[in-house]
Amino acid sequence: MDADGASATDVAATLAWATSLVPPRSLGATWELLASVAAREVAVARMLEPHLDALSILAEATREGIDVDLEPGGSWGVFAAEGSGMRLEARHHDGVWTLHGSKPWCSLAADLDRALVTAWVDDERRQLFALDLRDPAVRVRTGPWHARGLERVVSAPIDVDGAVAVPVGEPGWYLRRPGFAHGGVGVAACWWGGALPLRDALREAAASDRADQLSRVHLARADTALWVARTVLRETAAVFGAGGSASEGLRATRARTVVAEAVETTLAEAAHALGPLPLVADEAHARRVADLQIYLRQHHGERDAARIGGDIATGAGTW
């Protein structure tokens, strides 16, 4: 992989690099790519992941025989979040779909060409649409965005006033498809890769002449957690790549939880072992920590744990 043209401080160059990539042919290869990019620069992986996810969704639709009337060129995002006080609706008239309303958490909307967006088609159902973000009927807000991590990956609302959109699948297809679970673990692969340089810093500290037993304890805790997470990611990729299982959603949530906890462990061990110096004197280290802390908030923490427990309690999730 040659990511020399990609930079966390140059969004346009990063997106141009992302669009030049040929998407990996397997799920495992995709996650490996994302992890390797995140190990180099977390923010670049954060920009690449939704683009690859969008291309994967469009490819999945094609495999299922869904007719999507568009060419998948340019840079893509995936906007599926919901927020209090905001609602994006889709209306159908004379064979044309248009979108109306607001959508929160639209990462890089000002920089991307297009996005796959979920919108409400009635009071209970959402449907996926392809939206041209350069359409004059789309207004991209610049904030609020005061993040210290992922500073350039602005995730603000968009307002849409009648922009024409292309449907991708029927209502509910986006959430029902097997690839929905796959995409969630792709984000976790970014988290995992982003934490590897912190493990390297801990190893360097533990190998120094001034190291004591506590330095080795901090390293061991981070190393063990990341090793377990890698094992889980590999097994999950193998299961999904072989055709999945009857509980792909549960398996994906388990994997994301294991990885998120491993990365949080690594962040904590690095903070305790290395102290404040790299956070104030090492720009790359400080940026990586800040980026990971923001990125990890895509994990739903205790809510995901409650979902896992609920599924298991009702008889799902056999090993």
Language model segments and positions:
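Buried hydrophobic positions in well-ordered alpha/beta secondary-structure cores of metabolic enzymes
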Residues: 99-101, 195, 229, 275
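Hydrophobic packing residues in well-ordered alpha-helices of helical domains and bundles
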Residues: 47, 188, 219-222, 248, ...
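Glycine-rich phosphate/cofactor-binding loops in nucleotide/flavin-utilizing enzymes
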Residues: 277-319
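Generic structural signal for well-ordered, non-transmembrane alpha-helical segments
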Residues: 193, 220-227, 253, 257-264, ...
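C-terminal helix-coil-helix/basic helical segment that borders enzyme active sites and/or dimer interfaces
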Residues: 2-6, 228-261, 268-282
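Glycine-rich beta->alpha junctions and the first turn(s) of the following alpha-helix
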Residues: 145-227
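A short core secondary-structure module
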Residues: 105-140
